[in-house]
A protein has these predicted regions:
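Charge-rich, low-complexity N-terminal segments
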Residues: 1-136
Length: 136
């Protein structure tokens, strides 16, 4: 029997969506206000979901204390109150869209979580705009 456990986290970060190969006009057309050269910020909500079999001895799919610690060290400490474009190495050459942020977070956590467990990342950029990435 597989069960999914979820852990919520939050971080605040600034970013700018743009393509350096495009003109300012094209960036503004494609990314709108998000292309502001002075950046803008979001209060991100993150849901990390881990799915797997319940361990017969512990009753856990995954120890939530371990998951909490991984999220703190791999996501919150690295992204919270940061300018993603300027301060997070992965986004020096990768546009920090919600989609790309979710993939980066998934990659950071995947190697730290038992390979027998499924991992899914849901990232809310706003209460109505969110993405989910499951590594597929």
């Amino acid at each position: 029997m597989k069960v999914t456990v979820n852990r919520k986290a939050h971080f605040n970060a600034a970013h700018r969506l743009y393509n350096a190969d495009w003109t300012d006009a094209r960036n503004a057309t494609v990314f709108g206000k998000c292309a502001n050269p002075h950046y803008h910020g979001h209060n991100y909500e993150l849901i990390v979901s881990v799915k797997g079999e319940i361990h017969p001895e512990t009753g856990f799919v995954m120890d939530m204390k371990i998951l909490k610690s991984l999220i703190e060290t791999e996501v919150e400490d690295k992204f919270d109150h940061k300018n993603l474009n300027e301060e997070v190495p992965e986004f020096k050459t990768l546009n920090p869209t919600a989609e790309n942020i979710a993939v980066v977070i998934w990659n950071k956590l995947r190697s730290k979580i038992d390979e027998n467990l499924e991992l899914s990342i849901t990232l809310y950029e706003t209460p109505r705009n969110f993405v989910t990435y499951s590594g597929v």
